[in-house]
Regions:
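Helix-loop boundary and gating motifs at the non-cytosolic
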Residues: 1-48, 206-250
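Helix-to-loop junctions at the C-terminal end of transmembrane segments
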Residues: 54-66, 151, 256-273, 364
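Transmembrane alpha-helix termini and helix-breaking/packing motifs in multi-pass membrane transporters
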Residues: 142-161, 234, 354-374
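Conserved MFS/SLC helix-loop-helix module at the cytosolic interface between two early adjacent transmembrane helices
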Residues: 52-89
């Protein structure tokens, strides 16, 4: 793929910037703008919700202008936003900059996934998904360590400089991504001129089923950051350091073996639906183990070892599911309306992230094991749904490398063979 190294390097650099502020977001913006924590929290919540409403427009923009152009525009907006944050000392100024930045942040995953669809085909999509995820984890971890060191040396006043450093990271990432060259399928230009919109997405029942299945799995993705710390503190009565240890293990495994695990899955020839289902089942196994641990409540040493083992299983589920699930959604979307399709798919993650705090805390108040039970059922249901959807999805979505019979008889969307064709 032409420009692949530039894309990977750009994503890694931008991830360092993200890692410099995400773990300290409220504190970061409080010190950069001088506004109170309460005001910062309200502004970030409101602008984040508005950003969700903007996501369908981002999908339409991708379909009209192409993912690369929109990707570069979002990098420019994010760079400008962080460069302006130190000057946004008043509430209206901070709200304006936060809103513009939130629109770009919320839209970025859609555009990034669409860009992967533009620059890679077949098994290369799975490989690129895994490489990008590993770099994002490594970059965010490096960014968090970097800002921790900067704050230790120069104090909270250094937040202003990290904001500018973040702006610089986004600008450099944009310059690197500008070197990427999308690959077009024959007839794409004509397809883009054909009338299409969100009605087409809403009529695609298999893709909506895929989105619903991903919502169930996405609740599990939110568990590590939202449920895990509360569960340790309120049900297991463990030290806060366990949360830090869990995050460290998860980040290290994602960055260190993510590409290896995804490569092993890809070389096995497994269908993407089945790989994603396996990832969901590994999630379910980890959640059931949490129920067992919460029932037994052993001593602190045993709890520590058990929790770390559970995090390893959970992370393996993430590493198996993420590349396959991402490539599955990208490949199931018709190229002419891929932006709209992926905007719809991304809502599954956004809704899960928005619902997770209230859902988990409400269930946890009843019984510490209850949220894990709900998550285990959800993950198992997602796996079953993926297997059921397999025969209704396009063959090029289900298979990283479609069988020869399918490739030879490939047709445009609407007449294309599904995975069931390969069973004959």
């Amino acid at each position: 793929m032409e420009g692949e190294r530039s894309l990977l390097l750009g994503v890694g650099i931008s991830a360092v910037g993200i890692g410099m502020y995400v773990p300290f977001s409220l504190v970061f913006f409080h010190h950069v703008t001088g506004l109170s924590f309460a005001l910062v929290g309200v502004v970030l919540t409101v602008t984040g919700l508005i950003g969700l409403a903007f996501m369908p427009l981002a999908g339409s923009a991708v379909d009209r202008f192409g993912a690369k152009k929109v990707n570069l525009a979002l990098y420019a907006v994010r760079a400008a936003g962080f460069a302006l944050y130190p000057f946004a000392g008043s509430l209206p100024a901070f709200a304006a900059v936060a809103l513009i930045t939130a629109l770009a942040d919320r839209s970025f995953p859609i555009v990034q996934q669409s860009l992967i669809g533009e620059v890679a085909r077949g098994a290369a999509r799975d490989r690129l998904q895994a490489s990008l995820r590993a770099l994002q984890n490594a970059g965010m971890g490096a960014g968090a360590l970097l800002v921790s060191g900067v704050l230790a040396l120069w104090g909270t006043g250094a937040f202003t400089h990290t904001a500018w450093g973040n702006a610089f990271a986004f600008a450099v990432a944009g310059l690197l991504v500008s070197r990427v060259r999308p690959v077009r399928d024959a007839g794409t230009a004509a397809a883009r001129r054909a009338p299409a919109g969100y009605r087409m997405v809403l009529r695609d029942r298999p893709f909506l089923g895929l989105t619903a299945a991903n919502f169930l799995t996405a609740l599990g993705y939110a568990a590590l950051s939202v449920l895990f710390p509360l569960y340790i503190a309120t049900w297991l009565h463990g030290p806060d350091s366990l949360t830090g240890a869990a995050f460290t293990v998860n980040t290290a495994l994602c960055a260190g073996i993510g590409v290896l695990v995804a490569g092993r899955v890809r070389r096995s020839g497994a269908r993407r639906t089945r790989s994603a289902a396996l990832g969901s089942l590994l999630f379910a196994a980890a959640f059931v183990a949490q129920i067992v641990l919460g029932t037994l409540r052993p001593g602190q040493t045993v709890t520590l070892v058990a929790l770390l083992a559970i995090v390893v299983v959970y992370t393996l589920g993430e590493l198996v599911h993420s590349p396959s699930g991402g490539a599955l959604s990208v490949s199931a979307a018709p190229e002419a309306v891929r932006g709209r399709y992926l905007a719809t798919y991304q809502l599954s993650y956004s809704l899960a992230t928005a619902l997770a705090p209230s859902l988990f805390t409400g269930l946890l108040a009843l019984d510490g094991r209850l949220p894990w039970a709900v998550l285990a059922v959800a993950a198992t249901g997602a796996a079953a749904a993926l297997l059921r959807l397999e025969r209704h999805l396009p063959a090029e979505a289900v298979y990283a490398e479609p069988p020869v019979a399918v490739v030879a008889g490939s047709a445009p969307r609407g007449a294309e063979p599904t995975a069931a064709t390969t069973a004959s």
